[in-house]
Amino acid sequence: MGIRQMSNLQQRIIAALIGVPILLFCILYSDYTFLGLFLIVGALAQLEFYKLVGSMGDNLPLTFYGTFCGIVLHLLTFFIEKGDVGYQNYYILSPLLTLIFFIKLYKSKDEKPFKNIAYTFLGIIYVALPFALLTVLAFIQDDKYDPNIVMGCLFLLWASDSGAYFAGTKFGKTKLFERVSPKKSWEGSIGGLVTAMVVATILGNYFTNYTTFQWYAIGIIIVVAGTYGDLVESLFKRSINIKDSADTIPGHGGFLDRFDGLLLSIPFIITFLKLVR
C-alpha cells in the first residue's frame, strides 16, 4: 500500500517521523543550517502561493520576481540580525520592489497589471515576510542565535495542531467558523489550547531563557493567531475551490498548509517579546 492510500493520520505520522528530525537538526546544528532550511521552505511556500493565484482565471503574478524578492528579504534579515551587515542594507529592497512597475510595462499579455502587481506583493507580505521574521525571532535575545525559541514555538504549534486534530475528531460538534472551514470546531480549538499549555509548562522548565509565563503567552498567541492563520488560508483556498495548497507533505498538503499557522503568529510573538524583555 502506497503512502497516498494510507489514512490521514498514518500519513501525518510518517511525515512527522521524517520531517521533524530534519527540522530539529537544521535548527540545532547552526544558524546557517537554520537559514538554509527556512530559506528553502519559505521559497517553496511562496511558489505554492503564486501557483494558487495563477490558477484563478487570468491572474499572472510575477512568480520568479516575487520569490526572488522574498529570498533577498530573508537573506538581508538574516545577515542584519546576525550583525554581519548594517540595517541600511534594507534600502536595497526599495529599488528592487519598485522594479515590478517597469517589468509590467513590458508584459503585453497582462490585461490587469495592477491586480497582478498586488498579488505579487501579497505573496511577499503574506508568505516571505513571516519567514524572514522567523530569523528576527531566532536572534531576538542579545542578537545571538537562539535555537530554543524557534524550537519552542514549533513545539507549541505542533502541540496545538495535534490537540486540535484529535479533540476535533473525537468531540468536535460546535462549528468555529463554518462559512470558511466547516471541519474546525470550538472543541478542537480548546483541545489545541490545552495541549499547548501543557507543552508551555514543560518549556518553562527546560528552556529557561524565557519564563513559564512568557511561554504561556507565546502558546496563547500561537493558538489564537495560528487558528486565524488557518482560517485565512482556508478562505483563500475556498475562493479558488481547492482543498490543499499542494500535496508535497503527506497528510498535511503543501508547505503553505503546514506553516500557515506560523505565518500570522510570528509578528505577534516578536512584538510580545520585544515589549516584555
Features from the language model and the residues they span:
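Juxtamembrane boundary at the C-terminal end of a transmembrane helix
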Residues: 271-277
